[in-house]
Amino acid sequence: MATDVDGDRIAWREEGHGDLVVLLHGLGGSRISWEPQLAALSSSYRVAAWDLPGYGASAPLSGGPMTFAALAQAAADWIATLGASEAHVVGISMGAMISQYLAVWHPQCVRSLTLLATSPAFGLDGTSPDEWRAARLAPLAAGQPPAEFADRVLRAIAGPHIDEAALDGQRRAMARISGEALERSIECVVTHDARPLLSAITAPTLVMVGELDTETPPAYARVLSGAITHAWLQTVPAAGHLLNVEAADVVNAAIARHLKHVEEK
C-alpha cells in the first residue's frame, strides 16, 4: 500500500521495497499523477513520487525564482533524504526536463534515466516563449485556480483515446497545485535548454514519446535521444502527452525492461 510522507521540505508518496525508483511529475501534475507506475513497479522496487517544490504538500524553493539548477539540487537532496546514494530516475514532461539536469549536474545520483513526453529544449518548433507563457498564465491572471481549468488543459494535451478514469486521476493531481506554484513553473519551463549539456549524460537512458503528442512531439524525442550517448527511443502508438496514464501498461513494461537491463549489466 502506498504511503504519503511529509518531509521537512519535500512531500512524497512511496510504495514497495528494493532499489529506489523516483518519479518526477510534469508541470500540471503532482505525486498522485503516477498511480499506475507506483502500483506496477512497487512489486520489485521501492518507488517514490514527489510533489515538486511548491506543489501539493512540498515547501517552495527558498529564495529567488524557480530554476532548473535549483530543482535538480532539490531532487538530489530528496534522493539523499530517502537514504539512497543513487536512484533510477523517471520523469515526464517538466519532470523529465529536471531529470536531464539532474543527470548532468548530479550524475552520482542517477543509476538510470527514463524520459517520458519531453524535450531537450523549449520551443524546438519555433514556439514563442512569450506567447506560450501568456496563454498559460491567462487563466491564473483571471483568478482561476488550476482545479477550475484542469479538465480543459488535460483534454487538450491528451491523445484521443484516454479513458475517463485516467483523466480523472490527472484532474485530481492538477487540483493539488496552487496558482502561485504553477506560475513559477511556467516561468521556469520557458528557460529550458539542455542541448549543450546532453552529451555529458552517462546514465543508460530510455526516451519514450506518444505518437500523437502535440506538446512534445516525436521529433523532439528524436533530437533528445540522439544527443544522449546511451539512449534508446520508443514511440508509443496512439498516445498523447499524458503518456504514463494513456498507455500505462506499455510504459510500465518498458520501464521494467529498462531497469532490468541496467541492473543485469
Regions found by a protein language model. Give the residues of each.
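Short beta-strand/loop motif that positions the catalytic acidic residue
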Residues: I201, V207-V209
